Amino acid sequence: CTQTFYASLMADTYAEIAQTYPDAKADLLTQVSMFDTLYATSNVTIVPAHTDEGYGDAIIAWTKQKEKKRTFAVYVAELYARGLLPQSVMSVFVKTVADDLLECVRHTKVAQTEEHVDCLVRFMFAVASRVPEVKVHIRAVLSIPKAETPCLNMKSKFKLEDALKL
């Protein structure tokens, strides 16, 4: 949560840097290209049963990964709001997440897919107030009957509904 708190400050700082050093904007586009790797289906940490020997380490890894993804989403939304990310880049991010979300919510319920869906939902929520086109995609997901969305748990569904209010 601390990292997301600083996202707007970091975006403001980057905007100042980009004014002085125009190449910084191009560097930023390279930096945000980690999006595909960060939100890849294979990049999901699952928490084992609390009786598992590696439970403590897994909880730490899971928390760090979740925070990294949440912070990235808030940061790109702040960068976009300041004109540092072009509409085309943000649209690609939103479309990629929305398409993945539409597909994954329909998958058979397994821990990895449900966790991935939660991360995608959190991305949509983080950018919803800055990127209005997100809401069309959210409505599309929410319009799918519950019986057809085994990987969309109630917590994620409520998060999407909350995003529509932003």
Sequence positions of predicted segments:
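Alpha-helical interaction scaffolds
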Residues: 1-166
